[in-house]
Amino acid sequence: MPTNAQLTDEYLALVAERGGDAQGRLAAREHMNNSTAIYHHEVVDSSYVPRLYNRETHERFTHIAETTYSILSKVMHEYLENPRYRHVYDIDPRLVELILLPRGYDALLPFARVDLFLNEDDMSAQFCEFNADGSSGMNENREITASIANSEPFKAFAAAHQVRTCNEELFAGWVDEFLKIYD
């Protein structure tokens, strides 16, 4: 199995074979300039080189995500069910009141984005941020992927590898699940 670095090197070689692919880079930038990937009234910066992960790394991300979700769900369940446990958290009483309101859906944590640093040498991870309030990053990822998906280097790479994006899970899949909650 190629390493993530080897996949990236292969992709960069495809770009180099096309003399840097100025036309593809300009098309990607034009896509971004007309996209919905905007943060603080500015189009987000993006790289023309996608972040490529092999199967091992994808499986590691899956394990980290599922384990983290399980732990967070257990903590949230304990918080909701055990009043003595709540003192561990210094939360404004008004917010506690809102937290304890009935949800109207089963999931304790219907949405989260967990940011981490992954050491690709040993697959260890360090968390740097937890978010459960929304994520413009899902839309940014979708737009950035769309900006390069029709480029010649990307098409050549995809022809040689099984390429899978996470757009369905990150954006459309989330929208579908969100609508099911309130259907």
Enumerate the language-model features and the residues they cover:
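Preference for protein termini
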Residues: 1-183
